[in-house]
Amino acid sequence: MSTITTQKWLMNRRYALKGIGVSMALPMLQCMRPLRAASNKDQPKRSVFIYLPNGVNTDDYEIHKAGPEYELSRILSPLQSHRTNITPISGLYHPNSFGIAHKATNTWLTGAKYGPTDRNSISVDQLIAGVSGSKTRFPSLELSNQGHRLAVSADGVQLPAEKNPSVVFKELFTEPEGGIDKQRRRLNRRESMLDLVLSDAKSLSNKLGKEDRGRLDQYLTAVREVEIRTKRAESWLETPRPKIDSKISGKLNRNVPLEKLGDYLRTMYDIIVLAFETDMTRVVTFNTGNEGTGPAVPEIGVKRDR
């Protein structure tokens, strides 16, 4: 399945040209492309949603000359060589995000009205995953550098996101110890525990007031999501994960502290690319920061948290 190990002649895209005191990442060359990428007809469509917290200066992003001959803004100029393959969109309107300050992540992908008495709706990534998810081991992948979530289920419950690159890599590409039988026993135990939780919660629900029942219902929805994912994991037990070259594993299967934000983000982005290349998932959300605060970015001269 993986193009990483079966096509030994492929050059890693992060291979660097080193000399005269600098390092430069190579552009995408033909020798870096896997054979399966030769034909666009066979390529699945993928979606990745990356959230930049605390806003941006829209004047630096917006396209001021539209149409086929559009001109990229200053901050988007590094995409110039790809301009024929992308469509920048400006002027989107998100009225339900007004006035919620540092909680915009809650409705960024749902567009729903959200408040103390409102229930969120399904996020666009999960709508897409509902169509493409049956074809991959993971219907979607939820990532966040500080745990704040973007994906929302059809019942309005936020899906958990992982922030540790090593945990993400192992979940995608490392077979659990003990073989298939041990994995199946572990999943069966999880299902049994979930059944007990659901059974106890149903009996408790009749004793609660309206507000508490609503909160319990949201909790039970989250439990059911875990149950669905557990059953899905069991259905994929007989399908081996792709084998990843040890050099690539060494670069990506590691804990990267947030204090090294540039390294952290590059590692997460590379894991996303690898997940797409091996078709482990076709939908990803990645929240790159926390609303209201910002970590130091030593690579660009920001040496302390904000």
PLM region descriptions:
Residues 1-306:
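Ligand-binding pockets and gating/stacking loops
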